[in-house]
Curated annotation (Swiss-Prot):
Annotated segments matching region C-terminal-extended nuclear localization signal: 280-363
Family label: Belongs to the universal ribosomal protein uL4 family.
Extra remark beyond the main annotation: There are 2 genes for uL4 in S.pombe.
Quaternary structure note: Component of the large ribosomal subunit (LSU). Mature yeast ribosomes consist of a small (40S) and a large (60S) subunit. The 40S small subunit contains 1 molecule of ribosomal RNA (18S rRNA) and at least 33 different proteins. The large 60S subunit contains 3 rRNA molecules (25S, 5.8S and 5S rRNA) and at least 46 different proteins. uL4 is associated with the polypeptide exit tunnel. uL4 interacts with its chaperone ACL4 and the nuclear import receptor KAP104.
Keyword Transmembrane helix: no
Major location category of this protein: cytoplasm
Lineage: Eukaryota, Fungi, Dikarya, Ascomycota, Taphrinomycotina
Official protein name in the record: Large ribosomal subunit protein uL4B
Disulfide bonds: none
Gene expressing this chain: rpl401
TM spans (from-to): none
Amino acid sequence: MAAARPTVSIYNKDGSVSSETLALPFVFKAPIRPDLVRSVHTAVAKNKRQPYAVSEKAGHQTSAESWGTGRALARIPRVGGGGTHRSGQAAFGNMCRSGRMFAPTKTWRKWHVKVNQNEKRYAIASAVAASGVPSLLLARGHRIEEIPEVPLVVDDAVQSFQKTKEAVALLKEIKAYRDVIKVANSRKLRAGKGKLRNRRHVQRRGPLVVFNEDTGIVKAFRNIPGVEIVNVRRLNLLQLAPGGHLGRFVIWTKSAFGLLDSVFGSTTEVAQLKKNYFLPENIISNADVTRLINSDEIQSIVKAAGPSRVKRAHVQKKNPLKNKAVLSRLNPYAKAYKANVKINSEKTPKAAGEKFLSVLHEN
């Protein structure tokens, strides 16, 4: 279970605690599935890609013809003419300098990936539930050591902010501005060719502000480093779990937080804003399997652990015809048989003449 607190406090824009409280929405008790979130994020992130391809003319913008056989050279097309290093050089092939690539990329590649609707909803519910676990937020790198509580809910007056300085003042009052400072300090030059493609800098992610109605809040928060803003009806896995990693620091407005039960419903009540959707339910109520196994009720009926048997990693195959120990293990009578043969062979043999006479007598 992700969160267990029954109520959540509401904080005013000056950082003081309001007398009002809200019940914790059912979505914060949804199962947290990192494997599902990672796979859905990988698929959904592919739908934002821009098609790319090399030019159809690349590598073929020259005149070249094969010289044929008889010159002890490869039959690859070669540039004609003379008076330059280019003449006589191979062209067109993917193994050639200035040639085309093998299998030139096309824009009609299959770029998009279809994801099941219920799977996407499950992943978003898991990401929302994970945003209510302080340990996951800290593990993701958010600086939330000084904030009053998680989930963090602020009054609806924040939705009417018009100026960025008002938004910055709010973040400082609720002790969330440390996360913004972390983002600003993390801004660095991107490694690779992205620097030349309008992606010159990279930086970490900061808080995600979720609102219900935009009466100026988007413009107030949009220019703060690392801060993203989204409507509660348009929650996105790419923002709730950037990189497929659970634990995004989310700041909710009061009305947006109260609308979560209508957006996601519960395990027994259908969601009002989704058709025939129920929240996923845990298969087991207590996820601490170790505690269950070690409980007195289960240990009282479980057999005691016997001596450990370690299977040999590699068993050498031995020839029983050459190895006496293996032969005696396979055929216990072999040892006695060899002993009898040895005893019989030790008996005094007949003289050569007697043996010859006995053979003649038989004939």
